[in-house]
Amino acid sequence: MESANDTILRQINRGHDFAVAEQTIRATAEHGITIGAHLIFALPGESRESMLEGAIRLCELPIQVLKLHQLQIVKGTRLAEQYLENPALFHLYTLDEYLDFVVEVIERIRSDVYLERFVNQSPSEYLIAPQWGIKNFEFTAKLDKRLEELDTWQGRLKS
């Protein structure tokens, strides 16, 4: 998926819109197949509200697994060219900003969706930004601590 926003999906050349993904997910679910989805947060042009709404919409579908990760700018890609030409088009989260956003997402999605991953880390020699230097298990520990500090949990604000 990468995003539930059709404009963003066109920009990143996904070759489908949300309606096609939704139809495919529903058709696959009818056959009893476990379905996983994937979202990248902070794609250029996507607002915080759009990303949050997209995660909620996606989790209203019959998915069982969700992978999340931050946008990474990797050397040698079209995205890297765009970033180097005009970094103002990008809002790359700091680690704490991303942690807070993931908490917002978790609070609003179904509690039965298995969250498989929260961050991705490209090898440092290929990564332009963001340079967090953190592995998924380290982020997960920080996330667990933040959830505990806030006395919140997955699905707490699901309407």
Indicate where each model-derived feature is located:
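Auxiliary Fe-S-binding modules of radical SAM enzymes
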Residues: 65, 72-159
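Active-site beta-loop-alpha junctions enriched in small/polar residues
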Residues: 1-4, 40-44, 71-73, 118-122
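Short hydrophobic alpha-helical runs that function as membrane-insertion/retention elements
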Residues: 35-38, 67
